[in-house]
Amino acid sequence: MTNLMYIFCLIVWGLNFIAVKIQGTPVSLELSLTYRLVITAFLFIALVLFLKPKGKPTRKDIPFIMVFGICNFALSYLCLYYATILSSAAIVTLIFSLKVILTPLALRIFLKEQLHPRVLFGGVLGVVGVCVLIYPSLSSFSSLDVLKGILIALLGTVLTAIGDVSSARNARGKIDPIYSNAMGFTVGSILMSVIVLFQGQKIIIPTSITYISALLYLTLIASFLAWLFYLKLVERIGAAKSGYMVALFPVIGGIASVLIGESPLSIYLILGCLSSCIGAAIALGFRIPRRIKQM
């Protein structure tokens, strides 16, 4: 069961930005994200009411949970949505994998946690991987949108790292992650709703099969079920081993991007994904199991 949950999270989150690309822009990205966050918030609230887990947050924890929700679910998601539409899912997935380097850096800055040298070495390989993949786009003068997408993806990844700091602080306070997610998605959905209302957008729900199926995938599978399985994985095998899947996100996203015809199969894509995966694995402290070594 543990292996199935691991593979589920790996594939689902690796295809996250592919789903965003398929969903498209029949309505604004802000409105699409609002739908996703509102539905997910209701699902987690229902789960809280059903399970009533221990580890309730106190009043002093609320600001940190708000930062977690705003950074991880609202602003970072919005940035990554825009980046996916402007560039490609493969590029965004690759850039997002830099989270395994940016999060330890943020933890060092804000929570004074020790920064292992392997994070820096893995970070260099990760940056090299990103540079290799985006080189063809940067060498073309007609790819301003791609450049914007790359910069926005970097901003979204930085925001995620900041949100991870708040999440780490909440974990130290023994707050149950289900409470954090329920409140975080609620705060994120409220912020996005305010943005949509401020923009004066007409609230409509596209009825195309591609939009609805992508929305259901992003809410029920990628935001709700995957998070539940991930929390169970952390409980069973620890956060470090659970985090190894991030190292494979670029491969999943890259392969899917090629299969749907979004990105051409090129040496830049292969080398970029390979370098990023190796860098992420090093940063996470991945080790070859003893059984494999003996073989």
Model-predicted segments: where are they?
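C-terminal transmembrane-helix exit sites in multi-pass transporters
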Residues: 46-52, 99-124, 251-270
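Transmembrane alpha-helices of multi-pass small-molecule transport proteins
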Residues: 26-75, 102-103, 159-166, 182-200, ...
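Glycine-/small-residue-enriched transmembrane alpha-helix faces in small-molecule transporters
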Residues: 1-31, 143-169, 188-191
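Helix-helix packing/entry segments at the starts of transmembrane helices
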Residues: 33-35, 91-98, 166-189, 219-259
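Hydrophobic/aromatic residues within transmembrane alpha-helices
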Residues: 23, 32, 36, 83, ...
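Specific transmembrane alpha-helical segments of multi-pass solute transporters/efflux pumps
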Residues: 12, 16-17, 45-96, 132, ...
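Hydrophobic transmembrane alpha-helices of multi-pass small-molecule transport proteins
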Residues: 44, 115-137, 192, 247, ...
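Juxtamembrane helix-entry segments on the extracytoplasmic side of multipass membrane proteins
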Residues: 1-2, 26-30, 34, 57-63, ...
